[in-house]
């Protein structure tokens, strides 16, 4: 059976994206497939990496949110102009991405990026 193109690409990109979801334990792969299939998330498939994009709607702002990115960091950084173009075409006001602590060093070197907030988490299982 021939799979739709998005499904074929998502399957190919699983090796790049799954580690992100495994690290935070927020979604399993079936959740990822369902959100892409339903059009909630959009796959930006690159040769050696991938990103999942979500559009967030606030009362006064529309945000392109990079939910997950994995694979070649160099390739992801080079895709910045593509992400900007997607955001502009969808009339977004800004782009947001969460990253590992080390990503702050990379973002500081890129034009236009600034640190918005710091997130902390605590498992209630440990309390």
Regions found by a protein language model. Name each.
Residues 1-27:
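Short amphipathic alpha-helix that is part of the acyltransferase structural core
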Residues 21-40:
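Active-site rim helix/loop that mediates acceptor-substrate recognition in acyltransferases
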Residues 45-49, 89-92, 114:
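Short glycine/proline-enriched coil/turn segments at helix->beta-strand junctions
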Residues 61-110:
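Acyl-donor binding region in acyl/amide transferases
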Residues 114-125:
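Conserved catalytic-core motifs of GNAT/GCN5-like acyltransferases
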């Amino acid at each position: 059976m021939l799979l739709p193109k998005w499904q074929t690409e998502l399957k190919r990109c699983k090796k790049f994206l799954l580690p992100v979801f495994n690290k935070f334990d927020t979604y399993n792969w079936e959740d990822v497939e369902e959100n892409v299939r339903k059009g909630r998330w959009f796959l930006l498939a690159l040769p050696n990496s991938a990103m999942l994009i979500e559009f967030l709607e606030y009362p006064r702002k529309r945000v392109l949110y990079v939910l997950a990115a994995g694979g070649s960091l160099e390739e992801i950084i080079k895709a910045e102009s593509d992400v900007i173009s997607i955001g502009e075409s969808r009339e977004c006001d800004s782009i947001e991405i969460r990253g590992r602590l080390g990503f702050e060093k990379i973002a500081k070197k890129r034009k236009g990026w600034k640190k918005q907030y710091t997130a902390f988490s605590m498992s209630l299982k440990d309390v």
